[in-house]
Amino acid sequence: MSARLADVIEVLDHAYPPRFAQSWDSVGLVCGDPEDVLEAITIAVDATPAVIDEVPDSGLLLVHHPLLLHGVDTVAVSTPKGALVHRLIRSGRSLFTAHTNADSASPGVSDALAHVFGLTVDAVLEPLLGVASLDKWVIYVPLEHVAAVQAAVFEAGAGHIGDYSHCSWSVTGTGQFMPHDGASPVVGSIGAIERVAEDRVEVVAPARARAAVLSAMHAAHPYEEPAFDIFALVPPPGDVGLGRIGTLPRPESLSAFVARVGAALPQTSSGVRATGDPDMLVSRVAVCGGAGDSLLSLAAVADVQAYVTADLRHHPADEHRRASNVALIDVAHWASEFPWCGQAADVLRSHFGTALSVRVCTIRTDPWNLGARRVNDVSDSGRDQ
């Protein structure tokens, strides 16, 4: 029972495309040879010494948080992270990271979080804007030359939409221009305004074919200076991006929902805290695995009653509480991302079946390991103004 590391990477890159990662992030293979043969995969949020202890020799450790996120100028064994890298390499173990690409993927980190709360996801809190891969060309062509220009740009790769080819749209109008000294007009005279019946021809083409379409258009167009526009088409928002919005099976009080959150997540020393009217009804919820205070403004206008995330700081939470009735539920960072480990395991098991041993490491890697609370020390019935 085994698989090549390269085959596992292919599956992970399909599930959590690297192009979804934030520009500052570090994702993918950290150490290991893609041609290595694996017999086991261990999944965790963090790569720590205790977690690595559970990874079999020649196995893969798949983690959410990058071990080497910021600029690194040494992996000497005398450094904490360097020592981990050396341990992995010496024992033939590999390390792979799926971080913000897993945050934005569908399903991804926030989908897993929503699932453990019993939410049915129906929207993305902050959709990921796609990279423009298509251009729309608008070309103004004298009527008698339209067919030739269309044929040329189609041959260069334009005009394909799904299973259709030679697609275009046109409308007739009037073009106007005045040739000046040095021009060699096909139509009109130097110094005289000329008006010509022209078609506005629109076609789409892959952005990668821009140079070919431009060359073909120039070659077929009768004018020495054709009038044309190129618009980069941004894909509409889809089901990928940060955070998710979902609906509970039935409304429940905020206090009941907070209890639901606490029961669904692994216990941590910081537990679960919330702000809002305990008796308010909650039916629609926004969630974001990991640090999510950057999405507070979106949660405030998302038609939800509550927002679950991690690492909420005092001032952003205070400003939100003053301006919005959306309840905030703050959980431990590690706990909010741990459900993703099970999701990633399902992805791998569904592809490799019994050919690979896939397990989730249950070691709590939350850095906070102690906590204390003195009940009734502080009133929560109001605030100082």
Curated annotation (Swiss-Prot):
Record's keyword annotation contains Metal-binding: yes
Subunit structure: Homohexamer.
Domain of life: Bacteria
Name the record gives this protein: GTP cyclohydrolase 1 type 2 homolog
Signal peptide start-end: none
Keyword vocabulary terms for this entry: Metal-binding
Cystine bridges: none
GO cellular component: a single term: cytoplasm
MF terms (GO), sorted A to Z: metal ion binding
